A protein has these predicted regions:
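Short aromatic-glycine-(Arg/Gly/Cys) micro-motifs in beta-strand/loop hairpins
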Residues: 2-19
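A general, composition-driven signal for non-globular sequence regions
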Residues: 26-28, 32, 52, 64
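A short, exposed loop/beta-hairpin motif centered on an aromatic-Gly-Thr core
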Residues: 16-30
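Serine/threonine-rich, low-complexity intrinsically disordered segments
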Residues: 10-12, 29, 73
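Short, mixed-charge low-complexity intrinsically disordered segments
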Residues: 38-77
Length: 77
């Protein structure tokens, strides 16, 4: 059974929520499913906790991202 964790989803250039991200707590598949339910296919990447920390530490200074929504499947939003 896959362990639950926080997943971060980003939006790409030219998308409605460009420069923002969503955090969802769940398994890889359940978090992805929730993201599709909320935003369809209009988002860019899915990161696990380690990948997101790595991206944040290497992200160019001119790329600013803001939290749009945080969803805990067990507690919902």
């Amino acid at each position: 059974m896959e362990e639950k964790q926080w997943w971060t989803f980003t939006f790409g250039y030219g998308q409605q929520h460009e420069g923002m991200y969503v955090e969802i707590y769940g398994t890889f598949k359940s978090a992805r499913r929730k993201m599709f339910e909320r935003y369809g296919a209009k988002w860019a990447f899915q990161y696990n906790e380690k990948e997101w920390r790595d991206w944040e530490s290497k992200r160019p200074y001119y790329i600013v991202e803001s939290l749009l929504e945080k969803i805990d499947e067990e507690g919902e939003s």
